[in-house]
């Protein structure tokens, strides 16, 4: 049986934690930042965990993670 290929775009976007969950960067911090408040930008800065509804999909993208 052939090996399952890793989805490379997902491999660049998600990192696995020690407990097996995935963390990701939040959206809305790439451009048009002048109209966003400093507080809004600061709250978007930290990485957050992938929601439980999306975990199975992300795991299928990264079979060897």
Curated annotation (Swiss-Prot):
Keyword flag Ribosomal protein: yes
One Pfam family linked to the record: Ribosomal_L35p
InterPro entries from the UniProt entry: Ribosomal_bL35, Ribosomal_bL35-like, Ribosomal_bL35_CS, Ribosomal_bL35_sf
GO cellular component, one term: cytosolic large ribosomal subunit
Gene3D superfamilies with a match to the protein in the record: 4.10.410.60
GO molecular function annotations of the record: structural constituent of ribosome
An individual GO BP term: translation
Annotated keywords: Ribonucleoprotein, Ribosomal protein
S-S bonds: none
Record-stated family: Belongs to the bacterial ribosomal protein bL35 family.
PANTHER family membership: 54S RIBOSOMAL PROTEIN BL35M, LARGE RIBOSOMAL SUBUNIT PROTEIN BL35M
NCBIfam families in alphabetical order: rpmI_bact
Stated name of the protein: Large ribosomal subunit protein bL35
